[in-house]
Amino acid sequence: MATKIRLQRHGRKGYAFYKIVVADSRAPRDGKFIERIGSYNPNTNPATIDLNFERALYWIGVGAQPTDTARNILSREGVLMMKHLLGGVKKGAFDQAAAENKFEAWLKGKKDALNNMKAKVKEAAVADDKVKLEAEKAVNKARAEAVAEKKAAEAKAKAEAEAAAAAEEAAETEETPVEAAAEEAPAAESAE
């Protein structure tokens, strides 16, 4: 039976994640499969891969053909590298211990690179958040200054209005006794 290692789609529209399965090459994409050997979530940064290494190595060893994306995943996880090293052991180029040492060194380099990438992504996110926070602080400060200016202008206008009203009252009180005195004087003259 011709077997393939491929991805089986799950999830909702626009947010897919995949199961890594071994299936008959004639089976439909999301149909019957022989064995599930892992999962792949491309929605995270970096993509999350959970893979049963031993079973993937077994299926590659018995001739299962991975699809392009599955091949990239297996390569990233080191399954294809281990298959290559086991081929060298079979040919007698080196022994099993040397193959294990080479694989561990290769895997350590890959994990270091992945951790560096995660750190860079995290640093970029922190820097982006800092820039956004500074921009938001500047906008809030400008808004606060505008509100303070507006309140100061309103207070000044209110003070001026109160001063004008007080001046008008003072003028009215001054005018009222003069008018009253002026009214009394003609009344006194007319009485004579």
From Swiss-Prot:
It comes from the Bacteria. GO terms for molecular function: structural constituent of ribosome. SUPFAM superfamilies: Ribosomal protein S16. It comes from Porphyromonas gingivalis (strain ATCC BAA-308 / W83). Disulfide bonds: none annotated. One of its GO terms (cellular component) is cytoplasm. Pfam families: Ribosomal_S16. HAMAP family: Ribosomal_bS16 (MF_00385). PANTHER family: 30S RIBOSOMAL PROTEIN S16, SMALL RIBOSOMAL SUBUNIT PROTEIN BS16M. Residues 178-192 have a biased composition (Low complexity). Residues 153-192 are annotated as: Disordered. This is Small ribosomal subunit protein bS16. Keywords: Ribonucleoprotein, Ribosomal protein. Belongs to the bacterial ribosomal protein bS16 family. GO terms for biological process: translation.
